[in-house]
Amino acid sequence: MIYPTWREFLPERQRLRAAGLKLVFTNGCYDLLHPGHLKTLEASRALGDRLIVAINTDAGVRSMKGPDRPITPEAERAEVLDALEFVDAVTFFGEPTPLAIITALRPDVLVKGADWGAGAVVGEPEVLAWGGEVVRIPLAPGYSTSAIIAAIQSGTPLSSR
């Protein structure tokens, strides 16, 4: 299900907590969804009962990645993620970091890619303080949205990566 604002997910979070279900949270741009994203999201969902994915708004992606990004508008990125059987909820954030969402939802598990070093994961101290878990999932080698875009722009076939 797509929640236009993360605050709309709060009643569902209360229901999950009351039912004793474990909530997993991750976030990212998810522009040009690729197999690396799929592997990470599927592994994230396996860590709990429900997975919520917070995606950067278009303005947030532009501020991080530059004026030519995102390639895919936020509504379409959300629709694609929502169609995945291992993603239970999708929401958006326009702030530079997802800290406000993390502290409000208090996920049981916070997931990021293994490229995020110790102390670099936004929300890690907070999640650990309330007894949650922070998991860094190994990245599938060879996948990067930026690399895919560069290959397309240079005319290099993706098969020759």
Identify what each model region corresponds to:
Residues M1-R161:
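Nucleotidyltransferase catalytic core that binds NTPs
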